[in-house]
Regions:
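ATP-dependent carboxylate/acyl-activation modules
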Residues: 3-268
């Protein structure tokens, strides 16, 4: 079949680090969606057979109604950010931009800090966490309207609480790995292909008289992991492993900076 031939060709191209003159991609139909980005648009969800880290198609839906086109985009955006972190982290997303990202010593702490980062925007959002959701966390999640919760696991008591909301989509994620497929973006008349942006600098050079301490260095790395997933122009204000303000998608940096600093307020 064409998909089988494409898989073989792509395997050898990757093995030999070749850039193919012709690129054949094979996807299988996962779902026919109710509609696309707008109600008048037809839409479908196709997936590749791969072991991509935190890939949505490898997650198990435990509860809730089917995903929409926009839900899938938001969930994927949340998982892209979550895959950056090894430590316990919670990511909250609205309209494909993070509204709160935070680390913590527990899932409850990480979720609480992500919520506190922007308690307004998280309403109706998507939450992803790389740990087990317990009863205490579930009760806090249940207190607001969320579209989707994605986590690596759930306590039985947590599921009892969360499933009381009929329409809440609950997903159990596959284990994290370091597999990252190339990113493909459609453009008019073609596609763009690039390697996944999963690298941070090996070392940093302080160019100011005041040198950063270890805590500040960790915040720099935390901020870099988040900001690359924010729509440009992107500004992120962070402290102690928590976003305090996020300015996204403005046509100039000054506008994004004003939004981020205004959101962070006195904490900036």
């Amino acid at each position: 079949t064409a998909s089988y031939d494409a898989a073989i060709a792509n395997y050898f191209n990757k093995k030999d680090n070749l850039v193919p003159e012709k690129l054949t991609l094979s996807y299988k139909l996962q779902d026919s969606l109710r509609y696309g980005e707008n109600p008048h648009q037809k839409a479908y969800h196709y997936v590749q057979d791969n072991n991509e880290s935190y890939a949505l198609q490898n997650a198990v839906q435990l509860h809730g109604k089917e995903m929409s086109y926009n839900n899938i985009q938001d969930a994927s955006a949340a998982l892209d950010i979550l895959s950056e972190f090894e430590e316990i982290t919670c990511v909250a997303v609205k309209h494909m931009n993070p509204c709160g990202v935070a680390t913590g010593n527990s899932v409850f702490e990480a979720y609480s800090r992500a919520y506190e980062a922007d308690p307004v925007s998280i309403f109706g959002g998507i939450v992803a966490v790389n740990g087990k959701v317990d009863k205490e966390t579930a009760e806090k999640m249940h207190s607001i309207f969320l579209e989707i919760i994605l986590a690596t696991d759930y306590d039985e008591e947590a599921l009892d609480i969360l499933t009381k909301k009929k329409n809440l989509r609950i997903y159990k994620l596959s284990e994290k790995n370091n597999n990252h497929e190339q990113q493909i973006k459609s453009v008019r008349g073609g596609i763009l292909v690039q390697d996944f942006n999963d690298k941070l600098a090996d070392e940093y050079e302080s160019v100011t008289e005041k040198k950063v301490d270890e805590t500040q260095q960790k915040d720099v790395e935390f901020g870099l992991k988040v900001v690359k997933h924010v729509k440009s122009n992107a500004i992120v204000v962070v402290k102690d492993g928590q976003t305090l303000g996020i300015g996204a998608g403005q046509m100039n940096r000054v506008g994004s900076c004003k939004i981020a600093l205004e959101q962070a307020g006195a904490l900036a």
